[in-house]
Amino acid sequence: MRGKPKKTSKQPTLSQLAQRAKFAAVMQFLTPANSLLSNTFATPTGAKSRYNLATAYHLQEAVDWDGTEASILYDRALFSKGALLAPQNLAATAVAGNQLQMDWVNNSHGNAQPTDKLTVVVYEPTGRFYEFFMDAATRADATALLVLPPYLTGSQVQVWGFMTDAASPLKSTSQYLGAITVV
């Protein structure tokens, strides 16, 4: 059994400061997406929830420390992790009128079904705002036009997408689609 924590007069080490900053950055990034991650990130094992698994993944793989501050590595960040076949050639493009054009190849084979649903995650880092588009289209549609809120006009957003099986809990691992300026 552990004893009660005690106040210390020792200054934290650089390593401790780095770990605290990384943890804070990951928590600021993931907390608003908690409800999504709790349904889409990997398979819970033992006492670890999906959200805990996502936090552990991001602390190890998707956060950087430059010696003064921690930052999220968006190209390594994940919002889902699973065995479903990912959409092929998934791409996002800004379209005038606060719209986001999503395109992909219908690759319905293996465990991928034409009825699989596309989920899109849009993150605006300056204000730390999220927009989630659940069931945006089916795999067979191969395209979707999403309307973003007006407050994102002119902002650079980070975008991810993944598929969810309509009839089972299977998810594909999310794909980072890049930084896009909303027009």
Which residues does each predicted region cover?
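Short, solvent-exposed loop/turn segments in extracellular or other extracytoplasmic domains
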Residues: 137-143
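Solvent-exposed loop/turn segments flanking beta-strands in beta-repeat/beta-sandwich domains
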Residues: 108-127, 154-157
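Long, polar/Ser/Thr-enriched low-complexity segments
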Residues: 1-88
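An aromatic-rich alpha-helical recognition segment common to small helix-rich domains
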Residues: 30, 102-104, 120, 161
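Surface-exposed loop/edge segments in extracytoplasmic proteins
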Residues: 126-135
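Generic recognition of long tandem-repeat/solenoid scaffolds
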Residues: 1-3, 98-104, 146
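Beta-strand-rich modules
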Residues: 29-40, 146-173
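Pro/Thr/Ser/Gly-rich low-complexity, intrinsically disordered linker/stalk tracts
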Residues: 63-113, 137, 173-183
